[in-house]
Design a protein with these regions (language model features):
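Intrinsically disordered, low-complexity segments enriched in polar/charged residues with Gly/Pro
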Residues: 20-21, 69-72, 107-111
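Short, low-complexity N-terminal intrinsically disordered segments enriched in polar/charged residues
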Residues: 13-37, 45
Length: 146
């Protein structure tokens, strides 16, 4: 009987819907883990259509030396600092802390190691799925090094 109850409880728990807060935070983590580990193909899956060309451009700047340096240092680690969803549940923002990260500068392709940085991600709801809107960065403090 305990096995039946265990299966029943597990089934009920797994059927519960994630809250919008949990959804946006998990989407942000999944995106950042892919983005800061140069896995732009996966990052595109979590991105708006308007972000695709920017991610393709970044992917074209990744060379074998970048991948080797990433492999030597290890994967970037991502955590959520804060998140906010607008009242109508159509837009959100998540501030992530990324540790052990490499940043490739779009102009020139120079790679820089950053022990810790924050990235503010803008999310929009498209067809009932949260997606990251990541376009060419502005010099407005949206991405800041600690």
């Amino acid at each position: 009987y305990t096995l039946i109850y265990s299966v029943l409880i597990f089934t009920c728990l797994s059927c519960q819907q994630q809250t919008p807060q949990t959804q946006i935070e998990q989407t942000a983590i999944d995106f950042c883990e892919a983005f800061y580990n140069f896995n732009y193909t996966v990052a595109k899956e979590w991105s708006t259509p308007s972000s695709q060309s920017y991610l393709s451009f970044l992917a074209s700047n990744v060379g074998q030396t970048h991948l080797e340096q990433l492999k030597t240092r290890g994967a970037a680690k991502v955590s959520v600092i804060s998140s906010e969803i607008d009242a109508n549940l159509e837009e959100a923002s998540v501030v992530c802390q990324i540790k052990n990260a490499f940043v490739i500068h779009p102009i020139g392709g120079k790679m820089e190691y950053v022990s810790s940085l924050q990235d503010t991600l803008e999310l929009v709801r498209v067809n009932n799925k949260w997606l990251i809107r990541k376009d060419i960065p502005q010099q407005n403090g949206k991405q800041s090094h600690d």
